[in-house]
Amino acid sequence: EFTTITPLAREVEVDDDAPRMHVAEAVASGGLFDVELVGNVLEVRDGSGLIERCPDCGRVLQNGQCRVHGDIDGEDDMRVKAIVDDGTGTVTVILDRELTEDLYGGTMEDAMAAARDAMDKEVVADEIRETVVGHEFRVRGNLSVDDYGASVEASEFERSTEDPAARATALLTEVRP
């Protein structure tokens, strides 16, 4: 009842492209909605691949335990937590089930079958590591910065098609006086 809405006298441009930024610039902003970063995957963190989530709160279970709900039967899921570095800084990129399945090259059911055959859930994360570590990727998503560092909840994650030498030259041009 105390809100007033006033129409703008101008048109607002809608842009489907996310702004591309260097990691350091994006992190310094404190958080961004819909940003694009390009960098090399340095590591795929533990807790990637096949995971279990609490059916009540969605948190990832650790040894069958939810931090909030205790001992609980989890629901199967997949994710990737990757460290991406562009030379100016690093960010943790979190891929949901759909993006993880795309990266893995199969469904969660395929991944679970591979883990059963190997009798080891880590085979899925290991295969993803072999695919991405050391390669340059373009990531788009929402960036948040907190006490644990910077993270991006990815909406897109794909191998970069840019010339790495040209990107390196452009970066050096920006940072050299």
Language-model segments: residues:
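Single-stranded nucleic acid-binding proteins centered on OB/S1-type folds
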Residues: 1-177
